[in-house]
């Protein structure tokens, strides 16, 4: 079963969104 570009895009979003929020939260806490 091949991996489509859509699946890659969804996987990237799934990985990046929590990381983005963690980074944003970390910056808020470091103030």
UniProtKB/Swiss-Prot annotation:
Keyword NAD: no
Predominant cellular place of this UniProt entry's protein: plastid
GO biological process entries: photosynthesis
Matching Pfam families: PsaM
Recorded superkingdom: Eukaryota
Record keywords, A-Z: Chloroplast, Membrane, Photosynthesis, Photosystem I, Plastid, Thylakoid, Transmembrane, Transmembrane helix
Its membrane topology: Single-pass membrane protein
Coiled coil spans: none
InterPro entries, sorted: PSI_PsaM, PSI_PsaM_sf
GO cellular component term, pick one: chloroplast thylakoid membrane
Subcellular localization: Plastid, Chloroplast thylakoid membrane
Transmembrane segments: 7-26
Stated family: Belongs to the PsaM family.
Name of the protein: Photosystem I reaction center subunit XII
Organism: Euglena mutabilis
Top-level taxonomy: Eukaryota, Discoba, Euglenozoa, Euglenida, Spirocuta
